[in-house]
């Protein structure tokens, strides 16, 4: 069972209900909820929720780690094998489209980039700026330079690292994929699609609630580690704005406005990405999701605990 959707769409509640009803294990498919440093700001399930049914891959990665899609697939394979061995229904839930695509389409086989090349590229990025790196990328991989936004620091650095390390453009590697862990025709996949304005209001309310729950203290503890700002955990929605507040650059109210706005923009991108990249997912509203999923369970024998290994 795959449950995707934008942030704050009600995925966790649906997954918890299904796991309780059908003997399932909830497997995280959200890149930011992997990080143990970020329980509050990423809206991870609470300890009380995690105690109700088995949860896997939540808070298992240190913020200093640049956790890749390949590492996720490896971890997901272990969680899936454990679920099947225990006779539990695996329920993959999250909002990271690349993770779902890797699960159902396979993963491009990009070789690891040597540390010395990665460090050299990051050093030049900090020293010379993103425009210089974009110009260098245009010489080595014109197609990538044309495709990427000139200010997209992370993706420009990644594309340059790969072409320097392998001699091949990143797009070439993306054309070669490993076999999928979950073939699309063997899973039930839904995308929760709330009404936009209601979703955005929920995002704003949730960000305010996270601040009341201690998100600022959580981010302060992360900032004290002085990690590379390009690491994924350091770019989680709300983290950069709250760090700016902690540095005295903006007020807490301004940080809250920026953090909520960044999250709304991300939700909008999630709608677009899933519509174009994973059209096989069935789009449902949160209100109809329970009924639709129950119908899928009744009509699909693989959606049962007794055949969870199929």
UniProtKB/Swiss-Prot annotation:
Sequence positions that bind substrate: 7-12
UniProt EC number: 2.5.1.75
Residue ranges, annotated region (Interaction with substrate tRNA): 30-33
InterPro entries listed in its UniProt record: Dimethylallyltransferase, IPT, P-loop_NTPase
Required co-factors: Mg(2+)
Keywords, ordered alphabetically: ATP-binding, Magnesium, Nucleotide-binding, Transferase, tRNA processing
Cited SUPFAM superfamilies: P-loop containing nucleoside triphosphate hydrolases
GO MF annotations in UniProt: ATP binding; tRNA dimethylallyltransferase activity
Residues given in the record as ATP binding sites: 5-12
Catalytic activity, reaction form: adenosine(37) in tRNA + dimethylallyl diphosphate = N(6)-dimethylallyladenosine(37) in tRNA + diphosphate
GO biological process, any: tRNA modification
Domain of life: Bacteria
Site location (Interaction with substrate tRNA): 96, 118
NCBIfam families assigned to the protein according to its UniProt record, in alphabetical order: miaA
Function recorded in the entry: Catalyzes the transfer of a dimethylallyl group onto the adenine at position 37 in tRNAs that read codons beginning with uridine, leading to the formation of N6-(dimethylallyl)adenosine (i(6)A).
Complex formation: Monomer.
Similarity section: Belongs to the IPP transferase family.
Protein name per UniProt: tRNA dimethylallyltransferase
The species this protein was found in: Rhodopseudomonas palustris (strain HaA2)
């Amino acid at each position: 069972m795959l449950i995707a959707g934008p942030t704050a769409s009600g995925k966790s509640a649906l997954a918890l209900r299904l796991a309780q009803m059908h003997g399932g294990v909830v497997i995280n498919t959200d890149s930011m909820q992997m990080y143990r440093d970020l329980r509050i700001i990423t809206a991870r399930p609470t300890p009380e929720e995690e105690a109700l049914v088995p949860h896997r891959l939540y808070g298992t990665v240190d913020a200093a780690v640049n956790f890749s899609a390949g590492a996720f697939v490896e971890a997901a394979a272990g969680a899936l094998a454990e679920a099947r061995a225990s006779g539990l229904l695996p329920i993959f839930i999250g909002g990271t489209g690349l993770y779902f695509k890797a699960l159902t389409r396979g993963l491009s086989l990009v070789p690891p980039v040597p540390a010395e090349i990665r460090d050299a590229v990051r050093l030049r990025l900090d020293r010379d700026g993103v425009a210089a790196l974009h110009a260098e990328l245009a010489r080595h991989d014109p197609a990538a330079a044309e495709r990427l936004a000139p200010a997209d620091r992370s993706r420009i650095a990644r594309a340059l690292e790969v072409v320097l390390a392998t001699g091949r453009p990143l797009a070439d590697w993306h054309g070669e994929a490993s076999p999928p862990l979950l073939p699309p025709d063997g899973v039930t996949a839904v995308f929760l699609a709330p009404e936009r304005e209601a979703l955005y209001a929920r995002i704003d309310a949730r960000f305010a609630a996270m601040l009341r729950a201690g998100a600022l203290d959580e981010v302060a503890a992360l900032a004290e580690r002085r990690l590379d700002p390009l690491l994924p955990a350091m770019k989680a929605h709300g983290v950069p704005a709250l760090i700016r507040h902690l540095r005295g650059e903006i007020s807490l109210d301004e940080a809250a406005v920026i953090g909520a706005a960044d999250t709304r923009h991300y939700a909008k991108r999630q709608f677009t990405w899933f519509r174009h990249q994973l059209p096989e997912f069935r789009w449902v509203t949160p209100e109809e999701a329970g009924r639709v999923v129950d119908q899928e369970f009744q009509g699909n024998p693989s959606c049962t605990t007794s055949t969870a290994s199929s």
